[in-house]
A protein has these predicted regions:
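C-terminal luminal/periplasmic domains and tails of membrane-associated envelope-modifying transferases
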Residues: 423-428, 436-665
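Polytopic membrane enzymes that build or remodel cell-surface glycoconjugates and lipids
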Residues: 1-467
Length: 665
């Protein structure tokens, strides 16, 4: 068995197989349970209602060349979330193989180090957006594939000492596709210069000749790079452009530059690898942590086995030169990759969604960390063990990130099922306002596409029937008042509405969706909530909800199977019955929930049932639920006082008043 394994590990297929295993462990285990995230959702909506060609016009104000990539890929692969998740895995495998192939041509005597770089590049822990697949495959990863392929052709021509006009033209064409489709990789073209420089060190007679030949070889690509820089800058300054503005000149302060250098290098070169250890900072024995530990072991063993069987030059001179190049080129590439986001004034953080900027940094950061390991640990078993653990931790960390995406998609689907239960249909032109929904990887504009998908499954035209807005990001405090226009440009569509035609909703963590209003779900029922949300309650008009219509037909591809009819289903139906003044129905719903052994996650969800039992004469149950609510959340005492005062004409308040005076101090 051991002999067969060793025989396999020496075959050319061993390294690609190791990459495939690592990608599966880190990114692929939860693939069937993943969905759409961030801009995936509006892109899927555009594809569903307008078709692939719409991306060309949709990207014109942002990245005019990128729309063509979206148009081609969506024509070929459609818009199913599982398809894009699988394509994401294949794309990462292709990128890992490209990096490995390219670096083998540049550093042919450093097979082992090059493989470590490919592993680190593939699992780089700071880039946590693998599962935003629809967006990032098209927006960044395909352009990066073009650029790395272009580098590989250049390196291959130099290695074979060939001058081929067709291959050079192909390399320039791929460079053009990689640079002009997105600004993310603008700075990475400098890598080609250094790769040419490194390869030519082996044959150059003297430094002057070496540098001259390097420059001449790079010249055609340099011309394209300069043209790209001029085009990018001019387009960003034109009236056609509508996105981030270039602000590099305001950042050319010496102290700012030094601070950026230290922050970027420390964050991308060191902190990102140390951050992987936080998944075991607290040993809780959870299933996620156990699986992560298994992945750590399997990924470490896989990378150790694959790398230990690679032959590597061990002469000091060769090692020393390669360490120098790895570290130097790594540092330069880190800052070249940071340049576009830095020029736009965007921060570099290991958090969603700023971590997307690491996509142009991760190759340089991988060269840097492997170069340091080679330099410090030399060709020792300690280095093999150390780097195996680094790769294993990166794989385990990425799995834990994947699990947050899985949970978030479940929460998103559940959110829309709750919306459909509570608001089967809305008047056309309605805006849903909320402070923020408890989902991490989708914002209001992305969720707005799903809202229109749900309520307008046969949508045609350019005027959106519904909108969803986060108060925290779309409004200033003084704008939260009646009769304020709401005008939204959403890619190639628009929405025209008014704050007076709004429904204000609130969902707290694991709690149920609630429609806020000045009477039943007023400010007293959301203690501690943002003043943005409190001020918006007066705008909420539940009358815009068409409660007597059938629930919308939910696209199962997007929204999944209907969530179980648990407590939140009961609560949604209770709110509808309360809105209609049908108190008997509210009490009936509670009794059915009791039989099914359902209970709320939050005490505030007892309020409609307390009022219903009080108004229908079941004071014992009303008092019992009131006491339970106070004990669970004392800050609801003002809301309970108001609730019981509302029922004055229908009930005897003596018991309730006694309880409130005793418990609400």
């Amino acid at each position: 068995m051991k002999a067969k394994l060793n025989q396999f590990l020496h075959k050319p297929i061993a390294a690609p197989a190791a990459l495939a295993i690592l990608i599966t462990l880190a990114y692929g285990i939860l693939t069937p349970q993943m969905g759409f995230y961030w801009d995936d959702l509006p892109f899927a909506w555009i594809l569903r209602f307008f078709g692939p060609a719409e991306f060309i016009e949709g990207f014109r104000p942002f990245r005019p060349m990128l729309g063509y990539i979206f148009a081609v890929t969506t024509t070929l692969f459609g818009g199913h979330p599982l398809t894009w998740q699988i394509l994401g895995l294949l794309t990462r495998l292709l990128l890992g193989l490209q990096a490995w192939s390219l670096l083998r041509k540049v550093f042919p005597t450093r097979e082992r180090s090059v493989l470590w770089v490919a592993f680190a590049f593939t699992l780089y822990p700071a880039y946590g957006q693998q599962w935003v697949a629809f967006t990032h495959i098209n927006q960044e990863l395909i352009p990066l594939i073009f650029l790395l392929f272009s580098f590989t052709i250049t390196a291959s021509l130099l290695r074979h000492k060939k001058t081929s006009l067709p291959l050079t033209a192909l390399a320039i064409f791929l460079q053009t596709l990689g640079l002009f489709s997105t600004e993310y990789f603008f700075g990475l073209e400098i890598l080609r210069f250094f790769f040419i420089l490194i390869i030519l060190t082996e044959t150059a007679a003297d430094k002057k000749e070496w540098f001259k030949k390097t420059t001449l070889t790079w010249l055609p690509y340099l011309i394209v790079w300069v043209i790209n820089a001029a085009w990018t800058y001019s387009y960003h300054q034109s009236n056609a452009y509508n996105s981030y503005q270039i602000s590099i000149f305001s950042l050319l302060n010496p102290l700012t530059l030094v601070n950026e250098f230290i922050n970027t290098l420390s964050l991308s070169g060191f902190v990102v690898w140390l951050s992987t250890f936080k998944i075991f900072s607290v040993i809780d024995g959870s299933i996620t942590q156990i699986i992560a530990l298994v992945i750590l072991l399997l990924a470490s063993l896989t990378s150790y086995a694959a790398a230990s069987n690679k032959e590597q030059e061990t002469r000091y001179e060769e090692n020393h030169a390669t360490h120098y190049w790895f570290v130097l080129v790594g540092i330069i590439t880190i800052f070249a990759g940071r340049l576009p986001s830095w020029a736009a004034g965007l921060p570099l953080k290991i958090e969603f969604d700023y971590d997307r900027f690491f996509v142009s940094i991760m190759l340089g950061a991988s060269l840097f960390i492997i170069g340091l390991a080679d330099w410090i640990l030399k060709e020792s078993r300690a280095k093999l063990v150390f780097l195996s653990l680094v790769i294993g931790m990166a794989a385990a960390y990425q799995f834990t990130v994947a699990n947050t995406y899985r949970r978030d998609w479940e929460n998103t689907q559940d959110l829309f099922w709750q919306i459909s239960w509570r608001m089967p249909l809305l008047e056309t032109g309605t805006t849903i306002l909320t402070y923020e929904f408890p989902v991490q990887y989708l914002s209001d504009y992305q969720l707005m596409s799903a809202l229109n998908w749900m309520y307008a499954p046969n949508f045609e035209g350019r005027e959106l029937p519904y909108a969803l807005q986060y108060l925290k990001t779309r409004f200033e405090a003084f704008e939260i008042k009646a009769d304020q226009p709401i005008n939204i440009t959403y890619r190639t569509t628009t929405f025209t509405g008014n704050t007076s035609q709004s429904v204000v909703v609130y969902k707290e963590g694991n709690g149920c969706l609630r429609v806020l209003d000045p009477i039943y779900n007023n400010a007293e029922t959301i203690p501690g909530a943002s003043f943005y949300l409190v001020d918006a309650i007066s705008l909420s008009n539940p009358g815009l909800i068409l409660s007597n219509t059938p629930a919308p037909e939910m696209d199962k591809t997007l929204f999944g199977e209907e969530s179980s009819h648990g407590w939140c289903y009961t609560y949604a139906k209770a709110e509808i019955a309360r809105q209609a003044g049908n108190w008997e129905e509210v009490t009936k719903l509670y009794k059915e929930a009791q039989k099914a052994e359902l209970s709320p996650s939050l005490p505030v969800e007892y309020l409609p049932f307390i009022e219903a039992f009080a108004r229908t004469g079941d004071m014992d149950t009303a008092i019992k639920l009131t006491e339970r609510t106070i004990k669970g959340q004392p800050t609801l005492c003002p809301a309970l006082h108001t609730l019981w005062n509302r029922t004055t004409s229908d009930t005897d308040l003596s018991q309730a008043e006694s309880l409130l005076q005793k418990e609400c101090k």
